[in-house]
């Protein structure tokens, strides 16, 4: 199955400059003004260049590889302290008449921010009014508006971004410290012959007077001054600050404001990407502008009412490692509109031409990305029920995202619901789920262990040479797949932990994610 990024690729990636934003203040406007969408002129478009990100050496295994795993920081939130003037962090092209197009750097007056993730705003540049995605803007003249400020991203996320081989030494970002409330951390890429590419983290401490410092001998009144100073002088850092770390536009929360149940006529199916037992997957466009993937379900696959109810839950699951559900056509044949992932399913990717070139560190990083998405599913008390390589989608730079979460329980086909029917994925299913229908996050953990064998064997069917009935019988009697060729014993041990008979003895996805963390990172004072 295939799927994607919701906007054309070119404007979604850019390398940031160190120049501070314009600090000019602008006045307000009448709050009663009605939306009037007009495309903003192109005079403010910032030149961009493509980039990838890199995943690093896993704890269990050596090396590191390319993999974009981090979305842009979530900067904007509820209006605080009466602040209504915001600055655009990215270009945004509206998709419906009530939305507002804007360019990076535009100042926007917020009219209404009480309607969730889409705010009513007025551009002080173009004079137009309409709805904007709230995660594309930040309060004017705030730390959140600085291009080098990444907010609450984790240490691991910062490492993934900074370990891009395209980044020169000294590429950096500032983030909130994970260990000290109110403090910040400066993360900087470095290189030496012994360690190769690595990341150093420097804690930025705050003075009682409001200033900031890394070392007490050199103090600054603001973070902006600190960054400006260290961009000219290393002064104890591994390297002076050179480039702001590149990142990608965040996903908007849905296709547009109030675009959830959409008319079938608004979708155009263009290229068939795949076909399964229950339907097809197409690359297409929504409203003639937005690249999406469209999953079409055969009539009778599931109840439209049950699907719509489940979809209301699914659309609230938002994580960088889950394929985003954009919209639905709820009448049969049901259409599910999701983000488009350019490389299709992980299973096809592993078995295809690109799979030949994947090495163990890359495969383990893909597993780490999947574990990250499933750790979120775990935290949300949700269950996938059909976790396997065929239901993982791959994008540019080896980005992996979990798809089809929750749909399995809605399927009404007898060959599937019988649990031992021809269409049921016995080889991926935990014994308690296959035999007794006990699907839990722990049965998903079992499936993840099977998925690890798919990764390490480049898409080989699990339990080679065995039929479904034999697999179920032998697994019940204690059989577990042996270590695949060229797979480290440490990784096979992780698989076996996932296949423990007692579901409660299986690890959590949080634990599994931690076991696949990068290790080529040097800590400095965090």
Curated annotation (Swiss-Prot):
Chain positions covered by the region annotation Disordered: 1-57
SMART domains documented for this protein: SH2, SH3, TyrKc
Composition bias, Basic and acidic residues: 7-25
Positions bound to ATP: 273-281, 295
Cited PROSITE patterns: PROTEIN_KINASE_ATP, PROTEIN_KINASE_DOM, PROTEIN_KINASE_TYR, SH2, SH3
Active site: residue positions: 386 (proton acceptor)
Modified residues (Phosphotyrosine): 416
GO MF terms held by the record: ATP binding; non-membrane spanning protein tyrosine kinase activity
Species of the source: Rous sarcoma virus subgroup A (strain Schmidt-Ruppin) (RSV-SR-A)
Boundaries of every SH3 domain copy: 81-142
Catalytic activity: L-tyrosyl-[protein] + ATP = O-phospho-L-tyrosyl-[protein] + ADP + H(+)
Subunit structure, interactors included: Homodimer.
Similarity remark: Belongs to the protein kinase superfamily. Tyr protein kinase family. SRC subfamily.
Cited InterPro entries: Kinase-like_dom_sf (IPR011009), Non-receptor_tyrosine_kinases (IPR050198), Prot_kinase_dom (IPR000719), Protein_kinase_ATP_BS (IPR017441), Ser-Thr/Tyr_kinase_cat_dom (IPR001245), SH2 (IPR000980), SH2_dom_sf (IPR036860), SH3-like_dom_sf (IPR036028)
Enzyme class: transferase
PTM entry text: The phosphorylated form is termed pp60v-src.
Keywords: ATP-binding, Kinase, Lipoprotein, Myristate, Nucleotide-binding, Oncogene, Phosphoprotein, SH2 domain, SH3 domain, Transferase, Tyrosine-protein kinase
Limits of the Protein kinase domain: 267-517
Lipid-binding residues (covalent, N-myristoyl glycine): 2
Domain SH2: 148-245
Designated name of the protein: Tyrosine-protein kinase transforming protein Src
Domain of life (superkingdom): Viruses
Protein EC: 2.7.10.2
Function of the molecule: This phosphoprotein, required for both the initiation and the maintenance of neoplastic transformation, is a protein kinase that catalyzes the phosphorylation of tyrosine residues in vitro. Causes mitotic slippage in addition to cytokinesis failure in the host cell. Phosphorylates and attenuates the activity of host CDK1, possibly causing the mitotic slippage.
Alphabetized SUPFAM superfamilies for the sequence: Protein kinase-like (PK-like), SH2 domain, SH3-domain
